[in-house]
């Protein structure tokens, strides 16, 4: 039987999926996507496919991948989707199709408990207060029962717990086969399973870490793959940029100092100079950290900052101390395997520092971020099209890129150009939802000018009656932290509804609370614009404060704008609009998640109707009914 008939049978009314998966119903769009994926796998070709919400794209790419049975990598944008795929979707479809191959889940090492670090922390004590000590005892208890060491499974631990960085290894600090705990290592075990599996679920960060630096032990995965499927593919260009660049972080430097001190105190007690030099470096790193932000999150241009004499002086002192540390370690080389591996890290940091001082190299953005507690110095390529495009050419495999948000104004040009994708089959599959019936899009009249000082209160005044008429059940998605905090404060002052604010607890807990407290309002920013799935009555109103253009002074964007201009392009139309369109599509996509959902999206930005480019945004959004009258919005919400 050819693959098309096989796929048609799987997705038919009486097929394997209908018979084995509760609630499965055949969808024309899903079948069309499954055919396209199957064809790409058979021909070892590239496919770029946008599948609107409700298409059922996960099964549409999983079924053909399992049918062909080739070595497959599936890469997701978020760890949430990665876990959902591995723990929910894959077991269901594997059982339905009676697939007997091996499947594996692989994350980056920062997700796994490091037993060597755990031993060190138990021996030396944790960094932090009593609450961190309590977290440690939770981890020790969990370690007795876990088979994977994946922190996601430790449900008693918050995802942003301060204990996690103390208990995970980094590529630099990992001792590899020299580690006394290597035989029980969770990272090594996960990688071994991945290498032996027929289908591996990874995330984009891990995929590009491997592609860019060939981190030892994982380098064999991509070369063996015959099918590579990227879900949430709209995130790829930005993630790829991070990995084809260079970064030096305060964590790398603090970890280095800590590890040197451990060697001095345990293995080389006679090397007092080692401890002294490490302590001096630690002090220099702490001082340098304070120059890059003092509490608030700061991102800026490293080239510009490096011209300031105080920063340059502090940076040169950092280089000097690293050079001296290298000389001190040389005196003890061969006496400790741990110190030998630390020496390699120091040499690598020396190279990174040298590159960060060579700020005149073109084609890269030099930028920094800091908040008083930690910092990062980065060199990011302005384009990854040549590097990624070369990988596509060199590797004979099926490359499949899918997301609900890839096209802008009816084409994939922006996405394909950023990744150097050529000669790919391109397809747009529209959502099967009845948007004109299920949803209403409103750009209200009489909106305050976005530049006015009183915007916040005026906006709150306009929106609160609608939110209260809907009894909450609302996401307010903001484009800045100041607007997010300001609106939350306004609603808390003026309304009796439960107002939840991003950052006050973890993302998972906020969503849980939002669904449980039926009359609540969640005010959030970037991380809630995508990857959040709330179905049914719990969410029937999504408010977006303005079009999500990235601030033009954001260092990476600024560098790309300058580069585009130098090449004779139009940065606003070529870069800023396409990226804002994709972000807006993600935000709007939070509303209608199922055939029975109904609700309203309010976008508080006149530019959608007053500027020519507004049409590009509107064309890319679902074809909801439209109004500018908030009374009609209230009517629609009350007639649900």
Swiss-Prot record:
It catalyses: Couples ATP hydrolysis with the unwinding of duplex DNA at the replication fork by translocating in the 5'-3' direction. This creates two antiparallel DNA single strands (ssDNA). The leading ssDNA polymer is the template for DNA polymerase III holoenzyme which synthesizes a continuous strand; ATP + H2O = ADP + phosphate + H(+). Residues 16-278 form the Helicase ATP-binding domain. This is ATP-dependent DNA helicase YoaA. Keywords: ATP-binding, DNA-binding, Helicase, Hydrolase, Iron, Iron-sulfur, Isomerase, Metal-binding, Nucleotide-binding. GO terms for molecular function: ATP binding; ATP hydrolysis activity; DNA binding; DNA helicase activity; iron-sulfur cluster binding; metal ion binding. Residues 458-634 form the Helicase C-terminal domain. Probably a 5'-3' DNA helicase. Its EC number is 5.6.2.3. ATP binds at residues 51-58. It comes from Haemophilus influenzae (strain ATCC 51907 / DSM 11121 / KW20 / Rd). A motif (DEAH box) lies at residues 125-128, 231-234. Binds 1 [4Fe-4S] cluster. Its cofactor is [4Fe-4S] cluster. [4Fe-4S] cluster binds at residues 114, 174, 179, 185. It comes from the Bacteria. One of its GO terms (biological process) is DNA repair. Pfam families: DEAD_2, Helicase_C_2. Belongs to the helicase family. DinG subfamily.
């Amino acid at each position: 039987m050819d693959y098309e008939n096989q796929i048609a049978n799987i997705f038919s009314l009486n097929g394997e999926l209908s018979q084995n998966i509760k609630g499965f119903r055949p969808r024309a769009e899903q079948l069309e996507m499954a055919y396209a994926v199957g064809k790409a796998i058979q021909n070892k070709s590239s496919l770029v496919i946008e599948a609107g919400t409700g298409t059922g794209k996960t099964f549409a790419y999983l079924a053909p991948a399992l049918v062909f049975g080739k070595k497959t990598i599936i890469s997701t944008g978020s760890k949430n989707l990665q876990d959902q795929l591995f723990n929910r979707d894959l077991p269901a479809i594997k059982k339905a199709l009676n697939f007997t191959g091996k499947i594996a889940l692989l994350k980056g090492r920062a997700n796994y408990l490091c037993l060597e670090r755990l031993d060190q922390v138990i021996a030396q004590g944790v960094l932090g207060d009593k609450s961190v000590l309590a977290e440690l005892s939770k981890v020790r208890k969990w370690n007795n029962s876990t088979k994977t060491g994946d922190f996601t499974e430790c449900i008693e631990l918050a995802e942003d717990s301060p204990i996690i960085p103390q208990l995970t290894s980094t590529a630099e600090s990992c001792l590899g086969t020299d580690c006394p705990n290597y035989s029980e290592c969770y990272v090594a075990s996960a990688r071994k399973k991945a290498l032996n599996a027929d289908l591996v679920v990874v995330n984009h960060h891990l995929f590009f870490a491997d592609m860019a630096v060939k981190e030892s032990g994982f380098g064999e995965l991509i070369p063996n793959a015959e099918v590579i499927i990227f879900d949430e593919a709209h995130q790829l260009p930005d993630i790829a940029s991070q990995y084809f660049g260079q970064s030096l972080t305060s964590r790398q430097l603090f970890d280095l100092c800590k590890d040197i001190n451990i060697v001095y105190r345990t293995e080389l007690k006679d090397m007092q100079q080692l401890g002294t030099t490490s302590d001096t470096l630690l002090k220099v790193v702490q001082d340098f950290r304070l120059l890059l932000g003092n509490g608030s999150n700061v991102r800026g241009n490293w080239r510009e900052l490096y011209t300031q004499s105080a920063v340059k002086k502090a940076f040169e002192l950092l280089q000097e101390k690293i050079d001296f540390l290298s000389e001190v370690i040389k005196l003890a080389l061969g006496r400790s395997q741990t110190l030998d591996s630390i020496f390699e890290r120091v040499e690598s940091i020396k190279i990174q520092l040298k590159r960060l001082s060579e700020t005149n190299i073109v084609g890269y953005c030099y930028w920094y971020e800091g908040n008083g507690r930690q910092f990062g110095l980065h060199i990011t390529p302005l384009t990854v099209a040549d590097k990624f495009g070369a990988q596509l050419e060199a590797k004979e495999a099926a490359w499949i890129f899918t997301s609900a948000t890839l096209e802008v104004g009816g084409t994939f040009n922006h996405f394909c150009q950023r990744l150097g994708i050529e000669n790919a089959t391109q397809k747009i599959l529209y959502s099967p939802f009845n948007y004109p019936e299920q949803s209403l899009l409103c750009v209200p009249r009489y909106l305050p000018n976005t530049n006015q000082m009183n915007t916040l209160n005026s906006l709150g005044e306009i929106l609160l009656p609608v939110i209260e008429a809907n009894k909450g059940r609302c996401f307010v998605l903001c484009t800045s932290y100041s607007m997010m905090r300001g609106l939350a404060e306004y609603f808390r002052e003026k309304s009796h509804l439960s107002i939840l604010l991003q950052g006050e607890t973890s993302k998972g807990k906020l969503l849980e609370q939002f669904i449980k407290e039926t009359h609540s309002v969640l005010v959030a920013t970037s991380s809630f614009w995508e990857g959040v799935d709330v179905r049914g009555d719990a969410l029937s109103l999504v408010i977006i404060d303005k079009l999500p253009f990235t601030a033009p002074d954001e260092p990476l964007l600024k560098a790309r704008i300058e580069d585009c201009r130098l090449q004779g392009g139009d940065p606003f139309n070529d870069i800023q609009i396409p990226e804002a369109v994709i972000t807006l599509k993600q935000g709007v996509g939070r509303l209608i998640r199922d055939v029975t959902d109904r609700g309203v999206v309010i976008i508080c930005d006149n530019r959608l109707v007053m500027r020519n480019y507004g049409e590009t945004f509107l064309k890319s959004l679902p074809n909801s009914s439209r109004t500018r009258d908030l009374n009609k919005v209230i009517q629609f919400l009350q007639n649900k």
